Regions:
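A structured beta-alpha segment of the ubiquitous adenosine-cofactor-binding alpha/beta core
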Residues: 1-9
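Anion-recognition interface
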Residues: 44
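Accessory alpha-helical/coil subdomains and C-terminal extensions
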Residues: 3, 14-16, 24-37, 41, ...
Length: 188
């Protein structure tokens, strides 16, 4: 409250996704309860590309995230080719696989795994692994001992608690309750 009153802030403008919008809403409600009037405007920016916009109109943030992701993914693919290895990338997107798909498509990745692939079945670690292994086998048959797969983080967010427990994966969670995939540890 002190920051807002000291600086005579009358308008809170936020740019971001769901978490940013909900945080801004909580701030505005807190200030309102303290009898401090403030207007709150939120500009949706999401790399998920999942807002109901006209066909062919990407969300603010998606194109730049896809372009930067494709630069990284191309470099990883070159490393895979020159080293004769396979690499697996994870792309952001808690609830939609658009970014992973866009990156994988731009780089012609042999395997792209997105949550939308599992709309009629439960996502399991075994299914994810089998998809990647099937791609490795197909490429080997074609005479290629290298490759890369991109997996949307939404695939991991959709794992059931039981599946996570069985896998031995230990998640930490951010302040919004989302698993922090960059801080995953394995049970010993």
């Amino acid at each position: 409250l002190k920051f807002f009153t000291d600086n005579n802030v009358k308008l809170l403008v936020t740019v971001g996704g769901d978490d940013t919008a909900s945080t801004a809403n909580r701030i505005a409600k807190f200030l309102e309860a303290k009898k401090y009037p403030i207007a709150n405007i939120h500009v949706p920016k999401t790399i998920d590309n999942d807002l109901p916009l006209p066909k062919g109109t990407p969300t603010f943030g998606y194109e730049s995230a896809k372009d930067k992701g494709a630069v990284i993914a191309r470099a990883v693919y070159v490393d895979a080719r020159t080293s004769g290895n396979w690499f697996v990338l994870a792309a952001m997107g808690r609830s939609a696989g658009h970014l992973a798909f866009g990156i994988g498509e731009a780089c012609h990745y042999p395997m792209i795994v997105i949550p939308e692939m599992f709309d009629k079945t439960e996502i399991t670690v075994e299914k994810i692994v089998n998809l990647v292994i099937s791609s490795i086998i197909k490429r080997k048959i074609m005479g290629m001992d290298y490759g890369a797969a991109v997996i949307s983080e939404g695939v991991f967010h959709a794992l059931s608690d039981e599946e996570i427990r069985k896998s031995g994966i230990h998640f930490t969670y951010d302040e919004h309750g989302h698993p922090e995939l960059g801080k995953v540890s394995k049970a010993h």
